Curated annotation (Swiss-Prot):
The gene is AQY2. The lineage of its organism: Eukaryota, Fungi, Dikarya, Ascomycota, Saccharomycotina. Residues 69-89 are extracellular. It comes from Saccharomyces cerevisiae (strain ATCC 204508 / S288c). Residues 1-47, 111-149 are cytoplasmic. Water channel required to facilitate the transport of water across membranes. Involved in freeze tolerance, osmotolerance and cell flocculation in liquid cultures. Is non-functional in most laboratory strains. This is Aquaporin-like protein 2. The keyword Repeat applies.
Amino acid sequence: MSNESNDLEKNISHLDPTGVDNAYIPPEQPETKHSRFNIDRDTLRNHFIAAVGEFCGTFMFLWCAYVICNVANHDVALTTEPEGSHPGQLIMIALGFGFSVMFSIWCFWWGFEPSRFSLFVFGQSHLTSQMCSDVVSSDHCWDGCWWCR
């Protein structure tokens, strides 16, 4: 009988004045996951950042190429025949697309390299000094780079 009274006292001690048992502590719930694909919040954020970066790079490339094409097609100095394009226009458009790709890659590789840009965002370095040091340093080169041999 004494064991039953001790158990009863333990059970009563867990009850608050309203009579609700507050001794049960539910296990921690995991972060919100989409059960079908098992995607958590960080994965969604990373995919969003990658999608925005891809959009910016693609938009910059296509916008620069579009501007070059408009300049080439509206050049007053060139007289074109209605059936075709002038070779100078074709060369300018081809070089425009090439320089557009080069400009986009240069902007996102040298200027917006994630590790150095995050150092700037968190106040650990100046962006200008990081960009200048990138031009001088060869820490971006890979093993097969002809520049670093």
